[in-house]
Regions:
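P-loop NTPase switch module centered on the Walker A-proximal segment
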Residues: 1-93, 97-99, 137, 206-209
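Interdomain boundary/hinge elements
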Residues: 34-38, 145-156, 191-202, 237-250, ...
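Conserved C-terminal guanine-recognition region of P-loop GTPase G domains, centered on the G4
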Residues: 83, 89-151
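Canonical P-loop GTPase G-domain recognition
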Residues: 116, 126-189
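Short glycine/threonine-rich beta-strand-turn micro-motifs
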Residues: 160, 344-357
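Conserved nucleotide-binding/hydrolysis modules and their immediate coupling elements
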Residues: 200-302, 312-314, 475, 484-534, ...
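Helix N-cap motif at beta-to-alpha junctions
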Residues: 222-224, 272-274, 352-358, 400-404, ...
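Long insertion/accessory domains within large nucleic-acid-processing enzymes
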Residues: 250, 255-258, 389, 434, ...
């Protein structure tokens, strides 16, 4: 049976998972109507792919291995690894929005590897769809990225993903995805390898099974694999022995145990507990290892601590230091971009590839019943030959023209350098190079500045010399000086001073941050104070209390607004901000000592 290996790449929410699900339904791999590829609860909720997924379908006596890749830059190294194991990519582009920054990031990687993409212009049923313009923009993007003449001669398929329809031209009367599947068979080269050569494979992804332990997922580059003794080689040439105890292949979204597999196929193997991404599994100790896979370095770091607030242990099922450590160790088995330093007894230092990367880990933990607190995220600073280096990002922004001045001014203050600006209809596309510090906590402000109409995407560039101090608009914190239930009367007086994070009847404790002040100074407040009652009759009827809706705290929003003397307290049902030192007098004394 012939094998085709493809990946699906696209910007967040351009429809790649929807198309994959439709392909699986129409080839009979799954029957239910629900979204199947984004299996993680968070992925379904946010509508984004976080982990690359493997699936296989059978069509016209051909096995097609499909990898659904993440579209967010925080998960970029997932994408890069996957591209090494496939022969073509389906580039899914929204017919209205055209190619977006994340598309650019993944596409550049695939063109550099010599892959010839098939372009799928999706969502052609949108009222504002512009499929021809989107196709032109894709061609221009290919040119920009230095595509070869052969790569520029790409095949285009038009699609309505949610209805499961694909067309070779816009006026085709197609009712299903047959045109797309036929195009894959015609244009994607069949997987080739030498079946008689000694076996070699390189894992591009890791999985975990409670019974089998760490699982390695990869493509067999050559030879045939069976259970038994193997050698594992690091890219440096270091060799150790291992043993394959079980092997699986993918059928639909389920895995099927097999006894052997040949070159070109994608398999999952169990039995090598310390296997890592980029290592080569081979039959002979003197075989050449496959080229190393580069994994993006972490750019931000923060501390995970046991929750010690007055409300600790109320909601969480797993609250101890040991339980948090075990959960982080389990995460390290599969989350390659994550690094954890367990050397300090008081906290665990967790480093990741961006705010979203870490926020998703914390969100998953709280849903599983964990309770913890985290410190303010900090950018990782390196030192090389006596110079401080910090991570820089390329930020691409699409905004209506009237907001461009504000964005340029704001990012200028945050040490951003504009490298490109071009009008696109009523929108302007701007590209900046900016220190990661400059965009930590900026997304929320960006949505306010563009009234929700802007699109913001970033990707890691490199470590560069430290850009110096960054001026940000400082807000102070309103910290409760008492414990109890917040009253509407008190909150109504406080809301004039800034933005509140809590509503009436919320339980608070001393040192809990209940809002921020427009001025830069912290303020100790009493949110439980009621109205003084007297036996005097008031001269007029009491005015009704009107509370402005408060700002709901999420993990990402907490990252944006927290100060360096605060913790974000995360429990299964609540996200709260608190001062590290809860008592106001002790806080003031500590502040004086610092000064």
């Amino acid at each position: 049976m012939e094998i085709r290996n493809i990946a699906i790449i696209a910007h967040v929410d351009h429809g790649k998972t929807t198309i994959t699900d439709a392909i699986m339904r129409q080839t009979g791999m799954v029957t239910e109507e629900s979204v199947t590829m984004d299996s993680d609860a968070l992925e379904k909720e946010r509508g984004i792919t976080i982990y690359s997924k493997n699936t296989s379908i059978f069509y016209k006596d051909t096995k097609i291995n499909i990898v659904d890749t993440p579209g967010h830059a925080d998960f970029g190294s997932e994408v890069e690894r996957v591209l090494r194991s496939i022969d073509s990519v389906l580039l899914v582009v929204d017919a209205q929005e055209g190619p977006m920054p994340q598309t650019r990031f993944v596409l550049k990687k695939s063109l550099e590897l010599g892959i010839k993409p098939i372009v799928v212009i999706n969502k052609i049923d949108k009222p504002a769809a512009r499929p021809e313009i989107a196709q032109e923009q894709v061609f221009e993007l290919f040119l920009d990225l230095g595509a070869s003449d052969e790569q520029l001669d790409f095949t285009v398929v038009y699609a309505i993903g949610r209805e499961g329809i694909a067309k070779r031209s816009l006026d085709d009367d197609s009712k299903d995805l047959t045109p797309l599947l036929d195009t894959i068979l015609e244009k994607v080269p069949a997987a080739t390898s030498n079946p008689d050569a000694p076996f070699r494979m390189q894992p591009f992804s890791l999985g975990y099974d409670n019974f089998l332990g760490r699982l390695a997922i990869g493509r067999i580059h050559e030879g045939t694999i069976r259970s038994g003794e193997v050698f594992v080689k690091k890219p440096t040439g270091e060799v150790r022995k291992g043993k394959i105890i079980k092997m699986f292949t993918f059928e639909g979204i389920s895995r099927k145990e097999i006894s052997q597999a040949s070159g070109g196929d994608t398999v999952m193997i169990a039995g090598i507990p310390d296997i890592d991404i980029g290592e080569t599994i081979c039959m002979e100790a003197d075989q050449e290892p496959l080229p190393a896979i580069k994994i993006d370095e972490p750019t931000i770091t923060l501390n995970f601590l046991v929750n010690d607030s007055p409300f600790a242990g109320r909601e969480g099922k797993f609250v101890t230091s040991k339980q948090i450590k075990e959960r982080l160790e389990k995460e390290l088995e599969v989350n390659v971009g994550l690094k954890v330093d367990f050397s300090n007894g008081d906290y665990y230092k967790v480093s990741g590839r961006g705010e979203l990367h870490i926020a998703i880990l914390i969100e998953n933990m709280r849903r599983e019943g964990y309770e913890l607190q985290v410190s303010q995220p900090q950018v990782i600073i390196k030192e090389e030959s006596g110079k401080k280096l910090e991570p820089f990002e390329e930020v691409t922004i699409d905004v209506p023209e009237q907001f461009s001045g504000t964005i340029i001014e704001t990012l200028g203050k945050r040490k951003g350098q504009m490298t490109e600006m071009k009008p696109e209809g009523t929108q302007v596309r701007m590209v900046f190079e900016i220190p990661t510090r400059g965009i930590l906590g900026y997304r929320n402000q960006f949505m306010i500045e563009t009234r929700g109409e802007g699109i913001f995407a970033s990707r890691f560039l490199e470590f560069r010399p430290h850009a110096g101090a960054i001026s940000k608009h400082a807000t102070g914190s309103m910290a409760s000086m008492v414990a109890g239930k917040a009253l509407a009367f008190s909150l109504a007086n406080l809301q004039d001073r800034g933005v509140l994070y809590i509503g009436a009847n919320t339980e608070v404790y001393e040192g809990m941050v209940i809002g921020n002040t427009a001025k830069g100074n912290d303020m100790a407040v009493n949110p439980i104070k009621g109205k003084n009652l007297t036996n005097m009759r008031s001269s007029g009827a009491d005015a009704a209390i009107h509370l402005v809706p408060h700002m709901e705290l999420t993990i990402e929003r907490g990252f944006e607004i927290m100060a360096d003397d605060e913790y974000l307290e995360v429990t299964p049902h609540s996200v709260r901000l608190r001062k590290q030192i809860l008592n106001e007098t002790q806080r003031v004394q500590a502040g004086r000592k610092k000064a």
